[in-house]
């Protein structure tokens, strides 16, 4: 298994460079690629800021990639939850922070909106200090 960089996911989603897409697809025939949560976070930022994609487009594209057999996503189940919350209006960074801390007893924040954005199925309790 190899670790995948952000540009790998971006190419697979936007498909704006045929030779690079072919190289990635050929590699994925023989290798599995690990996608970390930090790569997901940067991919969201690139798609939003450079490619002007909407949160709905981004969430749908990333969700679709989680079904690709040769892509192994860190905390896949939690990531799907985060993508669902992101599509509903939550901040992607905040959702990644929550799932990255899923083994902690609680997540502490000063952000009063975070609990509402995370919804009732958050992977850990959120404690707001304000």
For every predicted segment, state its role.
Residues 1-35, 50-60, 121-130:
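Short, well-structured N-terminal submotif of metal-dependent ribonuclease cores
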Residues 4, 35, 73, 92-95, ...:
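Short beta-strand scaffold positions
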Residues 8, 39, 78, 96-97, ...:
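Alpha-helix capping/helix-boundary segments
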Residues 30-33, 70, 102-106:
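Short active-site oxyanion
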Residues 37, 60-87:
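Acidic catalytic patch
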Residues 85, 98-130:
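Acidic, PIN/NYN-like endoribonuclease modules and their adjacent C-terminal/linker elements
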